[in-house]
Amino acid sequence: LEIGAAARPFKTHHNALDIDMYMRIETELYLKRLIVGGFDKVYEVGRIFRNEGMDATHNPEFTSIEMYQAYTDYFGMMDLIEELYRTVTLNVCGTDTVTYQGKEIAVGKPWERLTMIDAVKKYAGVDYYSWADDAAARACAKEHHVDDELDEKSTKGHVLIAFFEAFVEENLIQPTIIYDYPAVSYTHLRAHE
């Protein structure tokens, strides 16, 4: 079964065809095949279904946009995303500023771009580079009371994510791009060059 992302699919059985069928959990693999096949730019807006837990930030069914572009880097993709949001917001709302949950969101301004390490330093005051090893990172997490989900196997990357969730996420009101996530956060990440 080729499904891509590290998530469990919803499974059913098609009685007339007598085969098991799966609802898709991502759009990534087929789009990447198109890029390899010679298309320079591809995207899909599609429904995604993941047979996993639910909470206020995770729904098992959602719509995503996935896009890939040859001959660019992730900064080029960041530019594309900003322009996409700016254009859609202007065309749909007639303005580049919208109100969401009582807060004005300025989509038209240049978005802040921070590495995850810089975001944690900015909002938590914690310097990732001061951690000599995983144990030092875990000790720092304990000191700041963000170690609830961590254990003795947690790496510096896990600790960075814990700080991000505890101190950074709630401060990201205006459009902001966070990049250079630690490799432990996603199975398909390519090492930063």
Task: Place the predicted regions along the sequence by residue.
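Intrinsically disordered or highly flexible coil/loop and linker segments, enriched in small
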Residues: D40, D73, L90-G94, V98, ...
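A conserved active-site cap/scaffold subdomain adjacent to cofactor or substrate pockets
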Residues: N59, T63-S64, Y68, T72-D96, ...
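Generic structural signal for hydrophobic core residues of well-folded globular domains
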Residues: L34, Y123-A124, F167, P182
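Class II aminoacyl-tRNA synthetase-like tRNA-binding/catalytic domains
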Residues: L1-G76, R86, E149, T176
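Aromatic-residue-lined binding/catalytic grooves and analogous aromatic/hydrophobic interfacial grooves
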Residues: C140-Y186
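Short coil/turn segments at secondary-structure boundaries
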Residues: E44-R47, T97-Q101, S130-A135, D151-G157, ...
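Hydrophobic (often cysteine-bearing) scaffold residues that line and stabilize catalytic clefts
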Residues: M23, T27, M77-I81, K156, ...
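Conserved small/polar residues in nucleotide/adenosyl-binding loops
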Residues: T187-E193
